Amino acid sequence: MDIDVGPVDPSVLYEQDLHVSSAVWEGQERGLLRCQEHTSLLHQWKLTDEQINLVDKAGFGYFRKIGPMSLNNSLISALVERWRRETNTFHLPLGEMTITLDEVALVLGLEIDGDPIVGSKVGDEVAMDMCGRLLGKLPSAANKEVNCSRVKLNWLKRTFSECPEDASFDVVKCHTRAYLLYLIGSTIFATTDGDKVSVKYLPLFEDFDQAGRYAWGAAALACLYRALGNASLKSQSNICGCLTLLQCWSYFHLDIGRPEKSEACFPLALLWKGKGSRSKTDLSEYRRELDDLDPSKITWCPYERFENLIPPHIKAKLILGRSKTTLVCFEKIELHFPDRCLRQFGKRQPIPLKVKRRDRKNRRLDDLDTSMSLACEEWAERGDHIVDSPGGGNVVDDGAYMEWYARISITKLYREAFLESQVMNMIACMREFEEAASGIALERLSPAEREVMESVKDTFANSLTFGGWQEVAVNSGYGKRRRRNEHTPTPNNGGGNDISSLLLQKEDS
């Protein structure tokens, strides 16, 4: 059964045929995504005071405090179904929302202002040279500790997790670089490889003071945007990137699957480290809850109450959350569109400007170099592109915006409820036809026409009375003419052998 769920206007969500929602509507469930963030062993690293000081200099002083975080795979999988890489936003019933730069700073404590993280891929020979020079030890290719310039996270932990008490400062720096490489490889730069991290990041920690001048938060968001975009394709079964950020973002904004809060402290991800982070709710239930989101379930500006916890140097950069700019992390280039989600800043949401289509095929090296150069130029001008509502204003439901949004988006994914509604609308049409047929004077028809009409009437009458649908149709008003796409409630007659359930079973078979 082909179901056209939209969008009515495909000019924005032009990749609908690739998106997982198209598979969901066809009943092709891919199941839960495999979440590739590996924080469970972070606590096994024993850092000395010297190492902690170097980690602070490198810009990860707050981030390292978060440590292991239990992930709710069902919730994450449901959120990914709402992500659209055409706009880098979640498409929810009340409009678009996204993870913005300021939220990276608040939730993770990472720097969102500074130099972009750029570089190029390295070969195996260069990677081994980097390990020898910056780590002081070499992984073994024979033992599969290194492959394609990527080292195993387990090798880093096994070799460097405890720095000798009598270590020289050079050895301390090597162990600290190994920890930082492990930290980013298991969190913000985690990949679908799962247990490996690229050595290309290692030179970023050669000078710890310089490392502290990078915009790690912007790079983390670029990687998460890319990971969400990839995972939103129906062909994918994994998701990587900083899933702690994704999950905490949801807890702050959406009253769905939230655990009990811990004591508030900075970074704000620590608020959600208490017991109960895992949930037994399945994907289909989260899908339904996201379909049913109403204003009471959304907190547009959740961080205002924590203002007294935010360090001054972090607070001074939060304005960049409203920067319409380009995020960079090595070869990854992603667009940051706060203008599509101004209600998250307490602003009125107008209809946003059209997003230019991205050509994701046949990316040549020279095209990538040109794009990277332009992206870095845009990032350098990030402070000049702070967006605001036309005329300012408070959060309001803008009728023009919601009317536009209804045309360009897809906000309902709970397929079972939609199909039941379609079945009930079909029954309403059958009821109308039966009533119309009953008003026809059969004596005016020829014998052959009369026989056909009586057969049709009997067929509709028998169908409607099967399972009690005649009474349901009358009492629920299903005989009334309805506008197209008008919501129809689903009756509950306590029986399992009715037309609706049989048709749904047939559709699922």
UniProtKB/Swiss-Prot annotation:
GO cellular component entries: nucleus
GO molecular function, one term: transaminase activity
UniProt GO BP: meristem maintenance; regulation of root meristem growth
Ranges of biased composition (kind: Polar residues): 488-503
Keyword Nucleus part of the UniProt annotation: yes
Disulphide linkage map: none
Phenotype caused by lack of the gene: Strong developmental phenotypes, such as extremely short, and agravitropic primary roots, small aerial organ size, altered shape and pale white leaves, bushy inflorescence and reduced number of seeds.
Compartments, as annotated in UniProt: Nucleus
Keyword Transcription regulation assigned: no
Tissue expression pattern: Expressed in root tips, the shoot apical meristem (SAM), leaves, mature flowers and embryos.
Pfam families: PMD
Record InterPro entries: AminoTfrase-like_pln_mobile (IPR019557), MAIN-like (IPR044824)
Keywords: Aminotransferase, Developmental protein, Growth regulation, Nucleus, Transferase
Signal peptide (residue range): none
Stretch list, region Disordered: 477-509
The protein's role, per its UniProt record: Acts as an important factor for cell fate determination and maintenance throughout plant development. Required for the organization of the root apical meristem (RAM) and the shoot apical meristem (SAM). Required to maintain genome stability and cell division activity in meristematic cells.
Protein name: Protein MAIN-LIKE 1
Organism the protein comes from: Arabidopsis thaliana
